[in-house]
Amino acid sequence: MKLRKILKSMFNNYCKTFKDVPPGNMFR
């Protein structure tokens, strides 16, 4: 569960940094 928390925080940081880029592009 710790890993999930870290991934979620990284995902949130990504969203804050690149608000104009759809987050889906990072995982496809």
UniProtKB/Swiss-Prot annotation:
GO cellular component terms, semicolon-separated: plasma membrane
Compartment(s): Cell inner membrane
Induction: Constitutively expressed. Repressed in minimal glycerol medium, at low oxygen, induced by H(2)O(2), the thiol reductant diamide, at 45 degrees Celsius and at pH 5.5 (at protein level). Transcription is repressed by CRP.
InterPro entries attached to this UniProt entry: AzuC (IPR049862)
Keywords: Cell inner membrane, Cell membrane, Membrane, Stress response
Membrane topology category: Peripheral membrane protein
Record GO terms (molecular function): enzyme activator activity
Protein name: Uncharacterized protein AzuC
